[in-house]
Structures are given as C-alpha cells and as structure tokens.
Amino acid sequence: GLKTFVLVHLPVLSLTVAIGVWLFYVQHQFEDTYWREHEDWAYVDAGLKGSSHLVLPKLLQWVTASIGIHHVHHLNAKIPNYRLQECLDENPRLQQVTRLTIWDAIKTLKLSLWHEDSQRLIGFREAKRLATP
C-alpha cells in the first residue's frame, strides 16, 4: 500500500537527490574555483578553472555518466557523456585542471564564502580568523 511505497521509495529518492545535489555542488565549489565579474569573465577560463574533475572509481564514473569530468562538459555540453573520458585523455590541456578525489570533495563542504582578496572559497572558521585583528 501507500505506507510501504513511502517507506521504500522516500529514502531511496532522498538519498538520490542528496547525492545529485552534492555532485553538482562539488563540481563548482572548491577552494581555487573561478569566480569573476561580468567584464572579467572568460568562457574558457570559467570552464577550465570554474569546474572540477571529480576523479571517481570506474564503476561510479559509469553510474554518474562521467559527470565528474565536468570541466569538459562545461566547455562543450554537446559532447556525449560516453565521450568525455576520451576527450580528457586526448587533450593534455584538459588534464591541467583541479582534480578532486571523493575525499577532497567531501572536504569542500566546509567552503561557504568567497574571499575576494585571495580569490578563493573559504569556510566560516577561516573567515572569522581573517576578520579578527
């Protein structure tokens, strides 16, 4: 009945949504990401510096349709997911980006604030430390 449906599907749906949101978040929220004002923004720099390469084990890369190779996707969204690894392998410039492991990605969860002077993301603890004279 409805109770069984909710008890089975709601946790699965919640976990799936949480993972999806986390994957999107870590692709863009890392310490040395690229954030610029409109007049200083550049397409290629935003693609290569503003999104990361989340290095996943092959099974997880397959399950996530290679979205960890996010910087290639940002440069050209028309590249099918099954060609992202090939594009990465054949283009040395695409390999010179921020690479995050799963552990690195988990650590980015503390990064919440953009520090304009250092042009990087920082956590609240560091912001408090920087604000204290």
Set out the residue ranges of the language-model regions:
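Hydrophobic transmembrane helical bundles of multi-pass organellar membrane proteins
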Residues: 1-133
